[in-house]
């Protein structure tokens, strides 16, 4: 039997910053002279980024935070003027540690601090509960990587997603597996998070529609480091491929343990 391949999909960080702030005011009849604008002190505008900068996926959270910092530096370098006033965007960075309770506490804190927008949160499990709070206080929420469809099913007009959702991602991975030569049977492992479960459910449905046989569906947690018991059980089913619904911080160790098992 050939070794099964590991099909993974982890959160990829991408940041798009759309800057806008201030109350709506009538447009002036003529642009203010540059000297007049420059003479006034720039208004400091808080722009937030929230995600896990500690814990197992801190590397992703830090990448997103650095992306926001770079974007705001570029915007500030242009000496932006909004409503005739010079403004400077000030980053407000918050660490939710990938924890839903911390995410909701941060969301309320950002509402109280009058942040004009937030890039975050990174995971579906943190983005969904936080979105309700951002909606209530009117802060635009831009998530770079939360994929669970429930995030946007609420219909909140202030919530934006910069990545395809699980329905699209799970289907794409399943269709890829079905077209891959030699893949007839698959096993699934998911981390029981909103992301992992959602991706795995769609993958299973579409995989079976495309003629693949799902021979096992195992569960782990997003904190696990030892996958040997799960992989040993899966090995007896002899799948051609394994779908892991989780993040790269666990996919790497899982792949190494697969190789150890042969």
What residues fall within each predicted segment?
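Extracellular/periplasmic Venus flytrap/periplasmic-binding protein
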Residues: 105, 148-150, 157-262
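Beta-alpha junction/loop-to-helix N-cap segments that form part of ligand/metal-binding clefts
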Residues: 60-63, 80-153, 162, 220-227, ...
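Extracytoplasmic "Venus flytrap"
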Residues: 37-69, 94-100, 123, 189-197
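Alpha-helical structural signal in soluble globular domains
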Residues: 67, 71, 78, 129-137, ...
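Signal peptide-proximal N-terminal region
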Residues: 36-42, 66-91, 208-211
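Bacterial N-terminal signal peptides that target proteins for export
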Residues: 1-10
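Bacterial signal peptide processing site
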Residues: 21-24
